[in-house]
Curated annotation (Swiss-Prot):
GO terms for molecular function: 3'-5'-RNA exonuclease activity; nucleic acid binding. This is Oligoribonuclease. It comes from Streptomyces avermitilis (strain ATCC 31267 / DSM 46492 / JCM 5070 / NBRC 14893 / NCIMB 12804 / NRRL 8165 / MA-4680). Keywords: Cytoplasm, Exonuclease, Hydrolase, Nuclease. Residues 5-169 form the Exonuclease domain. HAMAP family: Oligoribonuclease (MF_00045).
Length: 200
């Protein structure tokens, strides 16, 4: 893998891959130091009428409050949205299959990308960097860091959510990770030796 990280967030009409539609996708690419490269993209997608009609009320309320619902009629197609995101990603990630998908609880996003934007999804490495995993570990191992983490606006717009995820990982990197350059090789080998599982 190279040092690039592809941050993607999706907004949907719900969480069901069989019934719900992708309505917004945003992407930012960072380097390994979490510096954002370029302007990123944020695209509203016009969903099928059926997906709007069956949208759960809690989701409708959320997308109304964020202003996203009002923008859907002027949204673009899935194919056009994918082309725009892929063009931005390719500008900063030259080789396919090298950069991981990053974000918060990105397993759900990856499912919708695999269904609706397969060229984009397969351009990414199969690994993911999920900030929610770091957060769950911090809650268990470093509760003070967890409970003092940066507040989120919670406006449920894709690009804002990505920016918050990047800021959150920056925070956890500083608050709970070993400062760079980390342990020397001998120390790392000593620690590793303590965690080698016995042969079966």
């Amino acid at each position: 893998m190279n040092d690039r990280m592809v941050w993607i967030d999706c907004e949907m009409t719900g969480l069901s891959l069989s019934d719900d539609a992708l309505i917004e996708v945003a992407a930012l690419v960072t380097d390994s130091e979490l510096n954002v490269l370029g302007e990123g993209v944020d695209i509203v997608i016009r969903p099928p009428d059926a997906a709007l009609e069956t949208m759960p009320e809690v989701v409708r309320t959320m997308h109304t409050a964020s202003g996203l619902l009002d923008e859907l009629a002027a949204g673009t197609t899935l194919a056009d949205a994918e082309a725009q995101v892929l063009a931005y990603v390719r500008e900063h990630v030259k080789e396919p299959g090298k950069a991981p998908l990053c974000g918060n609880s990105v397993g759900t996003d990856r499912g919708f990308l695999a269904r609706d934007m397969s060229a984009l999804e397969t351009y990414l490495h199969y690994r993911i960097v999920d900030v929610s995993s770091v957060k769950e570990l911090a809650r268990r191992w470093y509760p003070r860091a967890y409970f003092n983490s940066p507040e989120k606006s919670g406006n449920h717009r894709a690009l804002a959510d990505i920016r918050e995820s990047i800021a959150e990982l920056r925070y956890y990197r500083e608050a709970i990770f070993v400062p760079q350059p980390g342990p020397d090789s001998e120390t790392a080998r000593t620690i590793a030796a303590k965690h080698v599982l016995p042969a079966q």
